[in-house]
């Protein structure tokens, strides 16, 4: 059976891993997943990530906790294969009044809503993280 939405699967693995207090989660890798993991690491939502394997690369995310609680309070898919959500630069949402981030896929790559606003770019809203 093929996976319909690999990004939603990635977000669910992160959510479930933190609910079970796992140190790390693994998943099949792709360029988009690595780009999302890079944004999550830069923003401090995950500890680290690495890609292992040549024929079937696996992405391993090291989850982050603060005083025993998961750093990621909520992670939510926005744009999905059945309903893509695109926003212009001045329509980009602020997640939790700026405390969270929106991960945006732009023509210049995957970045946060803050970085996209500064660069004057709009794009596809992949997910919200808080």
Curated annotation (Swiss-Prot):
Keywords: Ribonucleoprotein, Ribosomal protein, RNA-binding, rRNA-binding. This is Small ribosomal subunit protein uS8. One of its GO terms (biological process) is translation. Belongs to the universal ribosomal protein uS8 family. Part of the 30S ribosomal subunit. Contacts proteins S5 and S12. One of the primary rRNA binding proteins, it binds directly to 16S rRNA central domain where it helps coordinate assembly of the platform of the 30S subunit. GO terms for molecular function: rRNA binding; structural constituent of ribosome. NCBIfam families: PRK00136.1 (NF001109). One of its GO terms (cellular component) is ribonucleoprotein complex. The gene is rpsH. Pfam families: Ribosomal_S8.
